[in-house]
Amino acid sequence: MANSSARPAFLVMTALALLLLLCVGPGGISGNKLKLLLRKREAPAPTMTPVAVQESRAKEFLSSLRRPKRQLWDRSRPEVQQWYQHFLYLGFDEAKFEDDISYWLNRNRNGHDYYDYYQRHYDEDSAIGPRSAHSFRHGASVNYDDY
């Protein structure tokens, strides 16, 4: 009985001694490895690099730079007003243009709703219909492509 309880204690003591030997003992040429791991690295303090221009002069120079905004379609310019009036005279409608842009930009975002990523624009109620009977819905009174 005494022999069986002494074996785990002996194993624990051996493991502790081995751990202490590994951690505290000298690590060959480099010395104590645990101390080397735990010690903070000593680095020299960063030195200020010499600068040709003082900070205040540099900030003054950078703050003086102002980049003018380049707006081609600035409505306050008289030639732009003239161009815009001419576009309106030609039939250009800005609201319709914005609608068209949003339509064409969003067209491919939900393309899988229509058969195989294609949006086909023929009339469902036409007499002949599409060439393939399985490619489109027949007989509805609405052309679903328009919605």
Curated annotation (Swiss-Prot):
Location in the cell reads:
Secreted; Cytoplasm; Apical cell membrane
| Example GO BP | cellular senescence
The record's annotation in Pfam families points to: Augurin (PF15187)
Q: Which residues form the signal peptide?
A: 1-31
Q: What is its main location?
A: secreted
Say yes or no: keyword Phosphoprotein present. Answer: no
Propeptide segments, given as residue ranges: 32-68, 132-147
Query: What cellular component terms from Gene Ontology apply here?
Result: apical plasma membrane; cytoplasm; extracellular space
Is Cytoplasm set as a keyword in this record?
A: yes
> Keywords in UniProt for this one?
Cell membrane, Cleavage on pair of basic residues, Cytoplasm, Membrane, Secreted, Signal
According to the record, the segments passing through the membrane are none
PANTHER family assigned to the protein according to its UniProt record, in alphabetical order: AUGURIN
What's this protein's family per the entry?
Belongs to the augurin family.
Its job: Probable hormone that may attenuate cell proliferation and induce senescence of oligodendrocyte and neural precursor cells in the central nervous system. ECRG4-induced senescence is characterized by G1 arrest, RB1 dephosphorylation and accelerated CCND1 and CCND3 proteasomal degradation.
Q: What name does the UniProt record give this protein?
A: Augurin
Origin organism lineage? Eukaryota, Metazoa, Chordata, Craniata, Vertebrata
